[in-house]
UniProtKB/Swiss-Prot annotation:
This is Hyaluronan synthase 1. InterPro entries: Nucleotide-diphossugar_trans. Keywords: Glycoprotein, Glycosyltransferase, Membrane, Transferase, Transmembrane, Transmembrane helix. One of its GO terms (molecular function) is hyaluronan synthase activity. GO terms for cellular component: cytoplasm; membrane; plasma membrane. Changing residue 384 to Y: Loss of both activities. Its cofactor is Mg(2+). Catalyzes the addition of GlcNAc or GlcUA monosaccharides to the nascent hyaluronan polymer. Therefore, it is essential to hyaluronan synthesis a major component of most extracellular matrices that has a structural role in tissues architectures and regulates cell adhesion, migration and differentiation. This is one of the isozymes catalyzing that reaction. Also able to catalyze the synthesis of chito-oligosaccharide depending on the substrate. It comes from Mus musculus (Mouse). Glycans are attached at residue 489. It catalyses: [hyaluronan](n) + UDP-N-acetyl-alpha-D-glucosamine = N-acetyl-beta-D-glucosaminyl-(1->4)-[hyaluronan](n) + UDP + H(+); N-acetyl-beta-D-glucosaminyl-(1->4)-[hyaluronan](n) + UDP-alpha-D-glucuronate = [hyaluronan](n+1) + UDP + H(+). Pfam families: Glyco_tranf_2_3 (PF13641).
Length: 583
């Protein structure tokens, strides 16, 4: 007769946890030390006679990282494909046993065209009708916000939708209304014990299939909190979605399959693609970058069950777990300031902190709007970088509960911007022109190799244009990251609603300072090289390499820009005129 294994005692579990923490800290410090030493020492692994074409230990480390990341992403795609074949063999989902799901949509001053696409796609989701609820919460209850409520009522007209305009929200002060008829000093008065608006919202959400609530403005986190709190424990899973997102009909079903297959998975995200890639060169490059971010970087994380961020446009959470950390998630503070951005990343971190896995599936897909102007894109990236640095610190507390890859990748990605900035400044101020050009060639070469792998994985030649994103990172995103680092405790939506686009010029300041630093260093280096003696054999070889390298760099840009203008701008119809909003 088999005997049950004894459960470990509380002391044993505590010791095991402390040991894992200690080993994780040692591993993180080891990675940090090796990277810093490899960068600072500049150990060359291969070099030509004059040291002009050199390949160092740090470059080898980054190359190995990219190869490993690509390999694990490929293996994860194969794993997802195998799971899809198993699901297909099981047949369609049984409506009687399907998990109940609530689709929550966060809306704020949305472009009516995008909002209509979002709501229409929500209607078209291929999921058992009786097991799916739709809840949209509008951040704002003024007259100019109610067009979103009207559109919800119009799109779901045949579903008997319920709409409610709430004067407050869950966290706005509420004054009980006195009962009428009680007059005179000391007279008996009856007051309402609870907010009638909250009670009405919760009653509608838990009894009606399609509900839209417009509440007092409070920010996106307030909107999401209302949806989660009002739902309570009435559903099994909660899907998050933004109002500018168009869902693929199979998006929800594929997410549900991931959670159904493994109870250890607490949340799963899908493939977010760009809805407006042809609006501008910024949105086009963003569309390529998005694909790699999800199908290479997050696919790699998913292989180790530790996706760092379930993206807001398309994610699914186990509701019983979400309700456990809902209050802590909403009340998050950083340096004494209440956090109002980085909602999706902190939701993911809360799930990881409980020891549950987070996954990504490329079979679930949606299309979301991205900024088409450089200024708005810069504001968006600054906001995302703020939440990244802040959540990096929180995420570090739970590295020991997950695979070592989570620790390794967090350290590498966290240090990377600082090493890039240090390299650029050192070359501009202390390096020779050829050294600067050699680094630029290496950067574009690595970017082209990564783009070529993405083109092969996706089966789309146009992905090679992703290599053009490298200069955008170096010149725009890198200084924005440092602005984000020093302004992490400043809260807000970060980007404006799409109905009324507002320019934010604050992120331009670090770009201007960065440009002045680089121009100053370049002028200094050019002046020094102009006075140098170029008659020696090493200098002659450097001049030859400089001419050949400059020719290769210019040729690369000519080819890539030609592909972009001919293959993208001229052969694809571009949406012009920005947003045409009619309410």
């Amino acid at each position: 007769m088999r005997q049950d294994m004894p459960k470990p005692s509380e002391a044993a579990r505590c010791c095991s946890g402390l040991a894992r923490r200690a080993l994780t800290i040692i591993f993180a410090l080891l990675i940090l030390g090796l990277m810093t030493w490899a960068y600072a020492a500049g150990v060359p692994l291969a070099s030509d006679r004059y040291g002009l074409l050199a390949f160092g230990l740090y470059g080898a480390f980054l190359s190995a990282h990219l190869v490993a990341q690509s390999l694990f992403a490929y293996l994860e795609h194969r794993r997802v494909a195998a799971a899809a074949r198993r699901s297909l063999a099981k047949g369609p989902l049984d409506a009687a046993t399907a998990r109940s799901v609530a689709l929550t949509i966060s809306a704020y001053q949305e472009d009516p065209a995008y909002l209509r696409q979002c709501l229409t796609s929500a209607r078209a989701l291929l999921y058992p009708h009786t097991r799916l609820r739709v809840l949209m919460v509008v951040d704002g209850n003024r007259a100019e916000d109610l067009y979103m409520v009207d559109m919800f009522r119009e799109v779901f007209a045949d579903e008997d939708p319920a709409t409610y305009v709430w004067d407050g929200n869950y966290h706005q002060p509420w004054e009980p209304a006195e009962a009428t008829g009680a007059v005179g000093e000391g007279a008996y008065r009856e007051v309402e014990a609870e907010d009638p608006g909250r009670l009405a919202v919760e009653a509608l959400v838990r009894t009606r299939r399609c509900v839209c609530v417009a509440q007092r403005w409070g920010g996106k986190r307030e909107v999401m909190y209302t949806a989660f709190k009002a739902l309570g424990d009435s559903v099994d899973y909660v899907q998050v979605c933004d109002s500018d997102t168009r869902l693929d009909p199979m998006a929800l079903l594929e997410l549900v399959r991931v959670l159904d297959e493994d109870p250890r998975v607490g949340a799963v995200g899908g493939d977010v693609r760009i809805l407006n890639p042809l609006d501008s060169w910024v949105s086009f490059l963003s569309s390529l970058r998005y694909w790699v971010a999800f199908n290479v970087e997050r696919a790699c994380q998913s292989y180790f069950h530790c996706v760092s961020c379930i993206s807001g446009p398309l994610g699914l959470y186990r509701n019983n777990l979400l309700q456990q950390f809902l209050e802590a998630w909403y009340n998050q503070k950083f340096l004494g300031t209440h956090c109002t951005f980085g909602d999706d990343r902190h939701l993911t971190n809360r799930m990881l902190s409980m020891g549950y896995a987070t996954k990504y599936t490329s079979r679930s897909r949606c299309y979301s709007e991205t900024p088409s102007s450089f200024l708005r894109w810069l504001s968006q990236q600054t906001r995302w970088s703020k939440s990244y640095f802040r959540e990096w610190l929180y995420n570090a507390l739970w590295w020991h509960r997950h695979h070592a890859w989570m620790t390794y990748e967090a350290v590498v990605s966290g240090l990377f911007p600082f090493f890039v900035a240090a390299t650029v400044l050192r070359l501009f101020y202390a390096g020779r022109p050829w050294a600067l050009l050699w680094v630029l060639l290496c950067v574009q070469g690595v970017a082209l190799a990564k783009a070529a792998f993405a083109a092969w994985l996706r089966g789309c030649v146009r992905m090679v244009l992703l290599s053009l994103y490298a200069p955008l990172y170096m010149c725009g995103l890198l200084p924005a990251k440092f602005l984000a680092l020093v302004t992490m405790n400043q809260s807000g939506w970060g980007t404006s609603g799409r109905k009324k686009l507002a320019a934010n010029y604050v992120p331009v300041l670090p770009l201007a300072l960065w440009a002045l630093l680089l121009l100053g260093g370049l002028a200094r280096s050019v002046a020094q090289e102009a006075r140098a003696d170029w008659s020696g054999p090493s200098r002659a070889a450097e001049a030859y390499h400089l001419a050949a390298g400059a020719g290769a760099y210019v040729a690369y840009w000519v080819v890539m820009l030609t592909i972009y203008w001919v293959g993208v701008r001229r052969l694809c119809r571009r949406r012009s005129g920005g947003y045409r909003v009619q309410v």
